[in-house]
Amino acid sequence: MADVTIHVSRNDLPAGLTFDGAVAVDTETLGLKVGRDRLCVCQVGDGKGNAWLVQFDGTDWSAPNLKKLLADPGITKIFHFGRFDIAILHHHLGVDVAPVFCTKIASKLARTYTD
């Protein structure tokens, strides 16, 4: 496996990052209820061995760099069970995430149910 570089930041992605094509996105929360539970971390992977962990302190949801990436129509955001991640990102950051690709839905569509 190739080396992975993990970058950690508070409340937003660093300014000046550029991505092309697609990024993988995942969130970590304090629970599974969108209206009740807080977004703690948003993870972004570029598929080239870099991962950014954005840790939210619960007081600053402005995240202009992360919002710009999540709303960028030229970059596909890849999720697994995106329904929850997209909802929690919209609830806390107020961003409409698009375009998206959900690997959970794709796996159900591609399933052949054969031996």
Predicted regions located by residue number:
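N-terminal accessory regions of nucleic-acid-interacting proteins
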Residues: 1-23, 27
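Active-site-proximal helix-loop-helix substrate-binding element of RNase H-like nuclease domains
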Residues: 3, 43-115
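Short N-terminal binding/cap micro-motifs at the start of the first secondary-structure element
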Residues: 14, 32-35
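A generic structural signal for short beta-strands and their flanking turns/coil linkers
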Residues: 21, 38-40, 50
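Non-catalytic, usually N-terminal nucleic-acid engagement modules in DNA/RNA processing proteins
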Residues: 24, 33, 41-47
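Flexible glycine-rich surface loops and low-complexity tracts that mediate binding to linear polymers
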Residues: 25-29, 80-81
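Short, glycine/acidic-enriched loop or turn micro-motifs at the edges of active sites
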Residues: 29-31, 105
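Short, glycine/acidic-enriched capping/hinge loops at junctions between secondary-structure elements
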Residues: 34-38, 53-55
